[in-house]
């Protein structure tokens, strides 16, 4: 079969590094999925292969041009999404995805939806007062909600930001734990703090909390309140009981938005206890003003090394013989 060659000039050494990835992982991935050979020499990428293979590589790289042209690292999910767009004829939508900027982190990093489903999730939050997002860890459920919440707070679109999750590991019996309230709930709410730190200087957060602009508390502390002009994020909702989730949903006041996130495959509730998130899917699926979004493994955004570690463990689990049963 005849071979063809195409070259892609890169604007800077940093662009070449961003495109190639750590250890040229991105080039290896492109080669594996197209059959083409990719050779990076300085600020020029050479692609060799069949006409179809070369065309696929060039189309994917052109769709990701906003990344490597600005020397922003390209991740495995970025490549997966670009291939999916190419194979499904959604290249224009994918290019629009790259141009949509949600926010910038404190370090100046651009935050945008990585996948089509993430973009649908963002649109749902913007359009609805209550949005459920269900999917596995690492899909950006809480992070994207926090991005929109912080932007709303900084742009004075809401009066306060409320982050809550069930402290199921402590059975919500926080009175049995040593320390004051803040010391008791911090370990359970740390993932929410991590999202805040991406956008707000850590030293400013205590002042915002003191002024009531940011509240981070376990779910039990929402009882009996009406949350008006607030942006509320309910995290780890798979660990709520139906009664708990109903309680927090009915706290919603005028001018507020609520995002409920969780992974229904990873509940810490006792086996006999139904998850409030699962029940809500059935009860609220047709309620006007409520949206349900579903993310899956294709939306997982991981550090490339973490991805390789996960894949290595999966290969080991698939090939290892079952452990022997203990003798009776």
UniProtKB/Swiss-Prot annotation:
Sequence positions that bind ATP: 135-142
Keyword Cytoplasm belongs to the record: yes
One GO cellular component term: cytosol
Intracellular or extracellular location(s): Cytoplasm
Keyword flag Cytoplasm: yes
Family annotation (InterPro entries): P-loop_NTPase, PhoH, PhoH2-like
GO molecular function terms noted in the UniProt entry: ATP binding
Coarse class of the protein's main subcellular location: cytoplasm
The entry's keywords: ATP-binding, Cytoplasm, Nucleotide-binding
Family: Belongs to the PhoH family.
Protein name: PhoH-like protein
Lineage per the UniProt record: Bacteria, Bacillati, Cyanobacteriota, Cyanophyceae, Synechococcales
